[in-house]
UniProtKB/Swiss-Prot annotation:
This is Bis(5'-nucleosyl)-tetraphosphatase, symmetrical. It comes from Salmonella arizonae (strain ATCC BAA-731 / CDC346-86 / RSK2980). Pfam families: Metallophos. The keyword Membrane does not apply. Disulfide bonds: none annotated. Signal peptide: none annotated. Gene3D superfamilies: 3.60.21.10.
Amino acid sequence: MATYLIGDVHGCYDELIALLQQVEFTPETDTLWLTGDLVARGPGSLDVLRYVKSLGDSVRLVLGNHDLHLLAVFAGISRNKPKDRLTPLLEAPDADELLNWLRRQPLLQVDEEKKLVMAHAGITPQWDLQTAKECARDVEAVLSSDSYPFFLDAMYGDMPNNWSPELSGLARLRFITNAFTRMRYCFPNGQLDMYSKASPENAPAPLKPWFAIPGPVSEAYSIAFGHWASLDGKGTPDGIYALDTGCCWGGKLTCLRWEDKQYFVQPSNRQMDMGEGEAINA
């Protein structure tokens, strides 16, 4: 009965299956945690969604920014970009079933017994766990409702970038979405910076990676996240696990077995595409 945490899959279906075979994942007894961004850029987004959905209660996932963008494309709000390679999914006979399932997935996973929290981009140091749970539920409720296209149309944007319990309406939902799915850097007070994509050693002062600023959640729980492929799983404090290692860019797909903290990797089937260097931070 093992728990396996895997970073951003981004449509890399073959690598996902190979990695699960490598660790001898057994859905009947094991649990798979996925950090989000199941889709886009890799060639197999349709197969990834079909497989993950088929796992039922054996999988715990969170939504990433690319998953939300897919939902916006599906709703007719955003443009289907060829580089995302989503057309086979959008044109599949079971697209409605898959994407209506996807929009009902959470932004946050918490295991109190393991003292483990997972979100796609991480947990802002401005939140305690109760606030994070409440905020996740706010967005999840809208996404699972019939009014979800209205939210998806309004979610794009970098402001507001500072948390306040007084935030309301679409501004509140946009901050929550950015914190859970797009965050990388914060100012020392925890305010989000949504612009810098430099590596931590080159980030302009006074910005720090969100995980370098102490917060109530990181002080009491381990946090697993994806999103930030250029970290390559390195440079985080103890108890913070960066699992996106750029499989869709020619890197690797990374798995952490929680019980003994052993890592497993599956090299990407893609050659490193230097032309997409900026997009590694997307």
